[in-house]
């Protein structure tokens, strides 16, 4: 049975689709059976998949509905090693509960800004309530789109620690290649092999798989 990893945030622009597509493609290139489940009405991951050049072997993407999430994931769960759910943007936290229920791990990407932290307060409450009730899923913050050479990511790290949920050591940075790859239907593995962005994704994969497979 597959492990389900969800990228959830109540705020748009947090990097959910960028992380979902790159994380999944990295696992796919490792020989894993991987599916991206796109639950965002904006269909960003599905659009990404449609842009992929024919010469590249890219991870498959399936559109799923937030209301039918549990049934749809159950129907494909035995066919993959990992299912990565690209969560809907700007959705009320309470409506994310079906996605949370099917997840083994929820990653909450947070840009280094106070506004981003304020925007996910309700989601944090929902996740904590689920953990208190049933003891799962695993939940981790992921600092995303940090600007290298600044101290603000460190400041946000200190604020996130007060939320009493773990924070991944792996982070993603604000790099042009992430945006360029997404627009071209690629991941950083194809767009800039062995570059710094790929190194960040590989560090993320190592940490995430250690959490859910370890």
Feature locations, PLM:
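P-loop/Walker-type NTP enzyme "switch/lid" segment
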Residues: 4-10, 14, 21-97, 133, ...
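Motif I (Walker A/P-loop) of helicase-class P-loop NTPases
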Residues: 17-21, 120-121
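Structural beta-sheet core signal
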Residues: 36, 85, 108, 141-143
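Inter-motif core of Ras-like GTPase G domains
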Residues: 94-114
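Conserved C-terminal guanine-recognition region of P-loop GTPase G domains, centered on the G4
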Residues: 120-135
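Beta-strand-loop-alpha "switch" segments that mediate conformational coupling across diverse proteins
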Residues: 147-149, 157-187
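Inter-lobe coupling/hinge region of RecA-like P-loop helicase motors
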Residues: 179-202
């Amino acid at each position: 049975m597959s492990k389900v990893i969800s990228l959830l945030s109540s705020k748009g622009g947090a990097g959910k689709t960028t992380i979902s597509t790159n994380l999944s493609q990295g696992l796919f290139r490792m020989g894993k059976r991987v599916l991206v489940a796109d639950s965002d009405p904006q269909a960003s991951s599905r659009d990404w998949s449609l842009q992929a050049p024919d010469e590249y072997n890219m991870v498959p993407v399936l559109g799923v509905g937030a209301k039918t999430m549990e049934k749809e994931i159950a129907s494909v769960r035995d066919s993959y090693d990992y299912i990565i759910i690209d969560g809907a943007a700007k959705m009320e936290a309470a409506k994310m509960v079906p996605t949370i229920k099917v997840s083994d791990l929820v990653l909450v990407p947070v840009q280094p800004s106070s506004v981003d932290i304020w925007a996910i307060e309700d989601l944090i409450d929902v996740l904590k309530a689920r953990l208190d009730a049933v003891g799962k899923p695993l939940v981790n913050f992921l600092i995303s789109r940090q600007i290298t050479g600044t101290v603000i990511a460190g400041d946000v790290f200190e604020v996130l620690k007060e939320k009493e949920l773990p924070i991944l050591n792996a982070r993603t940075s604000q790099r042009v290649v992430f945006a360029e790859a997404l627009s071209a239907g690629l991941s950083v593995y194809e767009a800039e092999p062995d570059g710094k962005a790929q190194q960040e994704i590989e560090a993320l994969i190592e940490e995430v798989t250690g959490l859910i497979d370890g």
